[in-house]
Amino acid sequence: MMEILRGSPALSAFRINKLLARFQAARLPVHNIYAEYVHFADLNAPLNDDEHAQLERLLKYGPALASHAPQGKLLLVTPRPGTISPWSSKATDIAHNCGLQQVNRLERGVAYYIEAGTLTNEQWQQVTAELHDRMMETVFFALDDAEQLFAHHQPTPVTSVDLLGQGRQALIDANLRLGLALAEDEIDYLQDAFTKLGRNPNDIELYMFAQANSEHCRHKIFNADWIIDGEQQPKSLFKMIKNTFETTPDHVLSAYKDNAAVMEGSEVGRYFADHETGRYDFHQEPAHILMKVETHNHPTAISPWPGAATGSGGEIRDEGATGRGAKPKAGLVGFSVSNLRIPGFEQPWEEDFGKPERIVTALDIMTEGPLGGAAFNNEFGRPALNGYFRTYEEKVNSHNGEELRGYHKPIMLAGGIGNIRADHVQKGEINVGAKLVVLGGPAMNIGLGGGAASSMASGQSDADLDFASVQRDNPEMERRCQEVIDRCWQLGDANPILFIHDVGAGGLSNAMPELVSDGGRGGKFELRDILSDEPGMSPLEIWCNESQERYVLAVAADQLPLFDELCKRERAPYAVIGEATEELHLSLHDRHFDNQPIDLPLDVLLGKTPKMTRDVQTLKAKGDALVREGITIADAVKRVLHLPTVAEKTFLVTIGDRSVTGMVARDQMVGPWQVPVANCAVTTASLDSYYGEAMAIGERAPVALLDFAASARLAVGEALTNIAATQIGDIKRIKLSANWMAAAGHPGEDAGLYEAVKAVGEELCPALGLTIPVGKDSMSMKTRWQEGNEEREMTSPLSLVISAFARVEDVRHTITPQLSTEDNALLLIDLGKGNNALGATALAQVYRQLGDKPADVRDVAQLKGFYDAIQALVAQRKLLAYHDRSDGGLLVTLAEMAFAGHCGIDADIATLGDDRLAALFNEELGAVIQVRAADREAVESVLAQHGLADCVHYVGQAVSGDRFVITANGQTVFSESRTTLRVWWAETTWQMQRLRDNPECADQEHQAKSNDADPGLNVKLSFDINEDVAAPYIATGARPKVAVLREQGVNSHVEMAAAFHRAGFDAIDVHMSDLLAGRTGLEDFHALVACGGFSYGDVLGAGEGWAKSILFNDRVRDEFATFFHRPQTLALGVCNGCQMMSNLRELIPGSELWPRFVRNTSDRFEARFSLVEVTQSPSLLLQGMVGSQMPIAVSHGEGRVEVRDAAHLAALESKGLVALRYVDNFGKVTETYPANPNGSPNGITAVTTESGRVTIMMPHPERVFRTVSNSWHPENWGEDGPWMRIFRNARKQLG
């Protein structure tokens, strides 16, 4: 039976206005829209009155419910029938954890009520198209139609393909029908294999073969034999990449054989809880570094949010599934798309060439895709610290005549670093009889054929197959699985995981054969043991779907009880679906139909399938000299600063959590003005050391339109000039991931790919001492479509994205572009040696040109010398600022340094040649360094010792004030105010934020950037930062116990435990499942902290599901009430813990006036480094800190304080319960965005009880308790940041 329950309004006023504006622009007479959530409960038994009231209370969250009866035509948008939304999974979990076992499933839709004039059927279709994502949602016209969401279908049996009867044609037909993308020789191979087996193949076997042997999974082109211009080539592409490892194997622990590569890390104190006692402690051991970079291009073109989200999720799983289990740590993301053409902000170089119907626009991709990638990382609890963004779409001359080159098929890059124990780097042995396990969520009928689909050029496959190949994301589920993996690796030698892989392309049909084959075994499986929420799925759909957040593992049979215990505690679903066999054979039994859908020798599936040969011709690029007429430097500056590749990226940065883990030493945002210009990302290796890890990106894809090899060399060079900004030491410590994107088969591109791989793998990297132990290729970077009567193609440039990773010697010595105005000198190190090439530059692009000669690595020895020299200067502390030269050239390098330093520039480019345009806008490799004037001679001497004397040019100095002036020989070349440049540079991000977020907030932020008087972040402390008020109590040896409380989806508990640990507490890991099961109680604890994250993925309101699981369980409710009423206890709630505890007001004495925390005014997750003031309040944790103003990490989507009315707010204030407020950089309490990131009235962001024993706050003090983890800080701070005082106050209060 289904019950329908109304929910809160689903759209804010500005979202409704945006929708109405879109309808008006489409000339649709829609006058008014009201939207509210509707909940559907699928019940297995009726609810009594109390249970019904409980369900209603559970589903009451967010803004107040509307009291009026909605007017207008109903359009009900729900998840597609046959799928289960992540919302449903988590909401159902909450209902069950609150004791409502009669609820089979909860699902949610949005009821739109449309008031409109007379609309035709076609116009109504336009309206519905605006209101739902056809890839994930459907539209009903009555609430009762939602019954279809819970319809159960009968299982369907496997289908046989009549090869023996119909011969080869049966395989050809199946290939087309199922979208298998099989090549002719693969069809021959299968015909031969099944003829020898004497039986017909089943559809599931063909599908499994297609996925396992797709280009996406098998990398056939990189393993192919090559004939170029009639000449046999000696090596495959992959062998040339492997040559870098053969030449420089130093520091690499695992390459080419696992889900990620591993290199040596540092010996540090890894901090985690003991399995038996739950007590957190440091464990001195090597934290080796793993690295991986994936792409998820095809799904992102079809449906950007889930495409980018599952791209990030898949890469995170790759990291977690390395060795015998590892810990993902920090991420990077990148996008290459065609021109944005922002409505009302179209740029002169942006022409509309059309696109295929089934893919979305570049603007849609950059509106939704980054949000999807960020949301997954945020909810999983991984900071996203690095990235790139390129737009390119142009008609260019080539040997094929004029052709369209650009990124209609986008690049969506997802990568990152993690850590792994030394003993777990290599996978274990799979014993015969080992249990084969799927860890994670249920099988769903989604993501079918993603491996094969992504191996085709967009436009080749059927639209329904594109539709089927898009996946769905549930990061909170992946977090639960990762917690299980963490518990396993933390057991050391007792780790129950023998072997682990993630489930990606091809689903279990690829993952399970790979698992057993890599372990030297076969496998025997039972189809019906696979967790599935859709009983009507066919065997093919169950085995081959790409439902996300799943891992496959081999676990020794005797370790299964331990594994079961860990999964139950973390509430991570798992299923044992088979066992390993001695015979290298794959069999899949179907208990329902008592048949064998799969019965194959493994070598048929994974054996020597036909090897590809690429027989190709070289076509040299055809460039035209840059036409200069009409180009002025002033116009060029404005255009280049508007090019998205160059322009400010704030709209891509602040949506991503950059402080979670408490181990982020360098994020994108630099300095007191928080400008997104960092050279590289840096994390600390642990919570107790200054060793670390660095990541940087390099890519120069447009150059490939002129010179394939130069483009590849520049990508390596740029990654190197970016990562050089931190203290690494020997260049052999740097390891690279190479992600290759090409339109294989396009005339000239294959030979160009070979040329590029050879340039990097055989020549440049070996000469530099660099290794490429990991990478990925995507060989179908082309879209085809019909535009009117014309066939069109959009082909991406050959695109190599290099991600560089390294161990860092001391994270404190990371140099940023932030300029100082002390007596200084700016030096340009020009590795272009005066070539100043303008081909394929940002300058050329903004004038719709390509040019002829591009930049290149001019001298490999000098590039190596450059890296060594910068490392020497970093170690000697000689550099004040550093920024590499890249897109936009020297002009942009200097401008970004000035923005970060909020200062002027007095530059002289007389020594850079007579061509001023080329001097300012060439994109040859190099960097600008700032040194003290007194150090200039010594610095130039170091550079000369490294062979760079002829590359060094004095180009002026940073000065106080707002003028940005470039001269040559006494003549002004360019002069403008820095503020004006800053505003131009920011206009793209402003326009994107206006489109995507609350436009009022976007306007406020943009306006703030034009204020030259802004003093930036600053600190005013009312206490001695170096005083340890806890020291006398720690000296007694007594360590009070603090319960570090987490719920499923919480992700900030480890850094919270570490902060309390440092203050003299015994931090104990307590999961809500421990309390609900009675394994742990709160009676032994002196303090309790509820940690941040996304409990239940913020479903049913941020923190509200967590709170209700306490309130609706009598025993646990009593336990919390007793704790809060007990004198001599302290409690802290941070972020999600704050939201949760604000919903426990009925249990916490003195909290009656506490507010609720609701959606930010921006309607967006906000990750900021915000200034707050400690106000006079009873809070025991903030004693002695009143009046202090200091920055703190903020990361939340629902942090805005909501009070009932003005009287409620006045009472909260008059009682003195407000503990922290947001202030602007002038020290004034503020409601203005982004200084106040959530729009809370009077800047309120923390409150306390009348006794001061319980304090809740939205910002994250635990993430910045170490100075080194602050995005910016005064130079005189030591190891401890000022927020460490909160934790020491806690220890002091407990005596």
UniProtKB/Swiss-Prot annotation:
Gene giving rise to this polypeptide: purL
Compartments it resides in: Cytoplasm
Active-site residues, Swiss-Prot/TrEMBL: 1135, 1260, 1262
EC number: 6.3.5.3
Protein species of origin: Escherichia coli O157:H7
Residues the record lists as binding Mg(2+): 718, 722, 884
Protein name: Phosphoribosylformylglycinamidine synthase
GO CC annotations, alphabetized: cytoplasm
Residues where ATP binds: 307-318, 678, 886
